Amino acid sequence: MISKPDKNKTRQKRHARVRGKISGTAECPRLNVYRSNKNIYAQVIDDVAGVTLVSASTLDSEVSGNTKTEQASSVGAVVAKRAVEKGIKEVVFDRGGYLYHGRVQALAEAARENGLDF
């Protein structure tokens, strides 16, 4: 019997490969994305200190939108505004092993439009 590969396990393997190559510092932190079935989360992380500097998710009251993609772009805008307020302009984008498409792409483009460089 042919079994399908577990999508989340392959994503985790892909994420581990990417994380081996990138890490965030205080000068250029890492913008991490996590996507669940209902929500999307974004964090700006300083890996040297092991501290989350800024975060946003669809659970925040500032986030609006009807579709999941609209909500993701709203999360990107909110996390970018919060990062710029803290003086963070340049980040390294960590897509979390997800394909750069759909909600992840919408979040990244909204973050770029609102002042983050990556």
Swiss-Prot record:
InterPro entries: Ribosomal_uL18_bac-type, Ribosomal_uL18_bac/euk. Transmembrane segments: none annotated. GO terms for biological process: translation. GO terms for cellular component: cytosolic large ribosomal subunit. Pfam families: Ribosomal_L18p. Coiled coil: none annotated. The keyword RNA-binding applies. Keywords: Ribonucleoprotein, Ribosomal protein, RNA-binding, rRNA-binding. GO terms for molecular function: 5S rRNA binding; structural constituent of ribosome. This is one of the proteins that bind and probably mediate the attachment of the 5S RNA into the large ribosomal subunit, where it forms part of the central protuberance. Belongs to the universal ribosomal protein uL18 family. NCBIfam families: L18_bact. Part of the 50S ribosomal subunit; part of the 5S rRNA/L5/L18/L25 subcomplex. Contacts the 5S and 23S rRNAs. This is Large ribosomal subunit protein uL18. It comes from Ligilactobacillus salivarius (strain UCC118) (Lactobacillus salivarius).
